[in-house]
A protein has these predicted regions:
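Conserved, structured core segments of small domains
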Residues: 2-7, 11-145
């Protein structure tokens, strides 16, 4: 039997081609002063909302992964200059907003990724920076690795 005819006999139609999805990293910066100024229990309520929303996005295939980071005072910054390694405590930047976590989002484009990021409550008490993830396979090919 001709395969074309077999598909027609079973009433199979070709699947519509999905738009390519891209990955975006949403870096979540928090302002601890703003969090501490919230009413008692509000930060925990925000976290519950965040986790429920993350579970929904994962189920929809729009969230690849997410993690919360430990407090910035546990961080180390590593630099190598002129062959010497320097390790210092804490983040390098002197800023009120510190990196508190990240979400790896899958979306059709930057606009959709920004919409997804804006649904998280942390944009109200800090900032969520959304950046496209570079295709490492394309980089490998470009540099011959």
């Amino acid at each position: 039997m001709d395969l074309t005819m077999a598909g027609a006999a079973m009433n199979l139609s070709p699947r519509p081609k999905e738009a390519p999805r891209m990955q975006f990293l949403a870096l979540v910066y928090v302002d601890n002063e703003m969090l501490e100024a919230l009413p008692t229990g509000e930060p925990d309520a925000m976290m519950r909302t965040c986790l429920r929303h993350a579970d929904e996005l994962k189920a929809e295939g729009k969230l690849v992964g997410f993690q919360q980071l430990e407090d910035a005072n546990t961080a180390k910054s590593v630099r190598i200059r002129n062959g010497r390694t320097s390790v210092v405590d804490g983040p390098f930047a002197e800023t009120k907003e510190i990196l508190g976590g990240f979400n790896l989002i899958e979306a059709a484009d930057m606009d959709e990724a920004v919409r997804i990021a804006a649904e998280f409550p942390w944009a109200r008490t800090g900032c969520i920076e959304v950046r496209a993830v570079r295709d490492v396979d394309a980089v490998r090919q470009r540099v011959g690795a």
